């Protein structure tokens, strides 16, 4: 194969084709190949080459011609005969006004037509990472989350308080709580699967309607009991039709509330903040956690204030009015979220997905669909890349002793601790949780989400270990050991809430959007199972003297979560590196 310049090519075209008649000439121009004349034509009278829709002039400067050896027949067979529509004029190089070559070596100065591609600076990249994809939609999400969560937290405080006023025994409250956890354990996977195959906005509206309806039914049952039920035994109360309806409505209400929480915290916030904007996503998660803590405090305070001034039935009627008013507001806010985010929440469904939805909603197959959803959810859950981070979250739910709650309150009251100290301890834990939401976003910005998660778990495990040592070595009835014990538990909430925020973001990053609700529902289901197990352990070890055993189990679960997460962080897989390629932990410093 020989390479000649365009000048030689012009000579070849002008000279008679004698010895090189069987050669084929390739010009480096797409779609243009010169054909030799037919064998029947005179050697010096080659017909002009014709091609339809070609430009009237063709200027070729310093173009190499690839002359390859081939047969004449192959050259003729490669292309069909050219159409006699447009002749291709052969222009000699001397006719071209400017035949200077275009310099391509590095030292040559290039034309301004070839501009350098813009490269973002580190500050600009940080600004993009901290800017949400849809800021207006995110603010609308905050408003919806605040309003809906406030009504939900108010009701979560109202129904146990009303049952406690109705009957002095704790058994009715315990039964409702048990079946609530059981419904979440069984129903969360199938609800999560249904949410993954159903449009977001209609599902959001439907879940809000179900939650408000079940809250109203529960309130109606309690009001009916307060007006009609007199002094009765515990067994007589739990077998009444109104109580059975209360249990069923409470279970459905909790399941709908958790489904809404999973949708907003695992799916919607990711779409609005942006999966590739880790700082903005961390800040959004922190805001949602702050709103949750504020709603939990304000909801309990508002209903407690109402109970101190009005009759319980009047307070429940006020709560019902808030529920009814909340529904249209939540529906409008859902539409605003979608509109402000340029309809990012719209999800078109294919016919196959619609058939899946119809199959899941078939009442005749409810048991089969439930078992299938649990099996499918478990298979998807254990195959996710960020499984250790999710399992660590489940392990943290085993800590029911060294955390603010009913067991800790019972322990302190049994030891004769002043109620004011108990109240101050609960308030301090809430403050630490609120502070942790600010710390977590700062940690993500400085060290990345993976190291921030490890730091939160290590801090919590270390401080709970200190509290356990203080409990076993000193009497918490004394002032100094008691203060150290309570301070260690309160400070451990910094690590707990930090990992709660960061762990949520890790799952948001690692779980695909098409499976976010299914895997999130499965995690909630397993967490409910963990709480049921620890509740059973607490029932078995119901004496306060066995608190040390429960404390050891709690510390062991938190330490196990920290060890598992650090092992996962220290031995990353290729898939994990690819998933968190922008995390500082996996970024290589430039040499």
Curated annotation (Swiss-Prot):
Subcellular location(s) per record: Membrane; Plastid, Chloroplast envelope
Alphabetical UniProt keywords: Chloroplast, Ion transport, Membrane, Plastid, Transit peptide, Transmembrane, Transmembrane helix, Transport
Membrane-spanning segments: 159-179, 206-226, 242-262, 293-313, 318-338, 391-411, 419-439, 452-472, 482-502, 518-540, 547-569
Topology versus the membrane: Multi-pass membrane protein
First-listed, main subcellular location of the protein, grouped into a coarse class: membrane
CC terms in the record's Gene Ontology section: chloroplast envelope; membrane
GO biological process: one example: iron ion transport
Organelle targeting peptide span: 1-66
GO molecular-function terms, A-Z: iron ion transmembrane transporter activity
Domain of life, per lineage: Eukaryota
Family: Belongs to the ferroportin (FP) (TC 2.A.100) family. SLC40A subfamily.
Function: May be involved in iron transport and iron homeostasis.
Name of the molecule in the record: Solute carrier family 40 member 2, chloroplastic
């Amino acid at each position: 194969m020989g390479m000649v310049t365009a000048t030689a090519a012009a000579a070849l075209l002008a000279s008679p084709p004698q010895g090189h008649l069987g050669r084929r000439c390739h010009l480096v121009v797409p779609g243009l190949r010169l054909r030799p004349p037919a064998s029947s034509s005179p050697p010096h009278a080659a017909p002009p080459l014709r091609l339809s829709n070609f430009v009237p002039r063709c200027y070729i400067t310093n173009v190499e011609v690839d002359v390859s050896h081939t047969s004449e027949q192959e050259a003729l067979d490669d292309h069909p005969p050219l159409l006699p529509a447009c002749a291709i004029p052969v222009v000699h190089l001397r006719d071209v006004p400017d035949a200077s070559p275009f310099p391509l070596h590095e030292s040559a100065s290039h034309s301004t037509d070839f501009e350098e591609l813009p490269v973002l600076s580190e500050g600009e990249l940080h600004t993009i990472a901290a800017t949400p994809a849809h800021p207006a939609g995110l603010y609308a999400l905050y408003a919806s989350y605040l309003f809906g969560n406030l009504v939900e937290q108010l009701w979560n405080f109202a129904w146990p308080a009303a049952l406690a006023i109705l009957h002095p025994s704790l058994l009715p409250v315990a039964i409702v709580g048990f079946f609530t956890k059981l419904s979440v354990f069984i129903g969360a996977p199938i609800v999560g699967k249904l949410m993954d195959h159903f449009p977001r906005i209609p599902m959001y509206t439907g879940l809000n309607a179900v939650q408000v309806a079940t809250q109203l039914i529960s309130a109606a049952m309690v009001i009916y009991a307060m007006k009609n039920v007199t002094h009765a035994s515990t067994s007589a109360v739990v077998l009444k039709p109104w109580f059975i309806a209360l249990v069923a409505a409470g279970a459905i209400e909790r399941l709908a509330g958790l489904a809404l929480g999973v949708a907003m915290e695992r799916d919607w916030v990711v779409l609005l903040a942006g999966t590739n904007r880790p700082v903005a996503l961390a800040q959004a998660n922190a805001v949602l956690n702050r709103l949750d803590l504020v709603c939990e405090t304000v909801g309990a305070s508002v209903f407690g204030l109402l109970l101190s001034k009005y009759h319980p039935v009047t307070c429940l009627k006020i709560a019902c009015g808030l529920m009814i008013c909340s529904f249209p507001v939540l529906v409008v806010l859902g539409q605003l979220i979608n509109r402000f985010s340029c309809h990012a929440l719209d999800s078109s469904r294919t016919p196959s997905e619609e058939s899946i939805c119809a199959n899941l909603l078939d009442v005749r197959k409810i048991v089969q669909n439930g078992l299938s959803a649990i099996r499918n959810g478990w298979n998807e859950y254990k195959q996710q890349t960020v499984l250790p981070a999710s399992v660590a979250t489940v392990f943290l739910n085993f800590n029911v002793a060294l955390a603010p709650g009913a067991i800790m309150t019972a322990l302190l009251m049994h030891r004769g601790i002043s109620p004011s100290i108990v109240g101050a301890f609960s308030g301090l834990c809430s403050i630490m949780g609120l502070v942790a939401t600010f710390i977590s976003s700062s940690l993500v910005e400085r060290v990345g989400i993976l190291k921030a998660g490890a730091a939160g778990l290590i801090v919590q495990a270390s401080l709970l270990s200190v509290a356990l040592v203080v409990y076993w070595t000193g009497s918490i009835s004394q002032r100094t050991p008691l203060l150290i014990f309570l301070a260690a538990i309160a400070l451990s909430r910094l690590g707990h809430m930090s990992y709660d925020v960061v762990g949520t973001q890790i799952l948001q990053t690692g779980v695909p959007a098409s499976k976010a609700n299914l895997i999130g529902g499965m995690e909630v289901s397993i967490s409910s199972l963990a709480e049921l197990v620890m509740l059973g352990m607490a029932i078995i070890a119901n004496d306060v003297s066995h608190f040390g055993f429960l404390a050891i189990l709690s510390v062991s679960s938190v330490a196990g979560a920290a060890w598992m997460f650090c092992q996962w962080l220290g031995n990353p897989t290729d898939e994990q590196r690819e998933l968190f390629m922008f995390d500082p932990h996996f970024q290589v410093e430039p040499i």
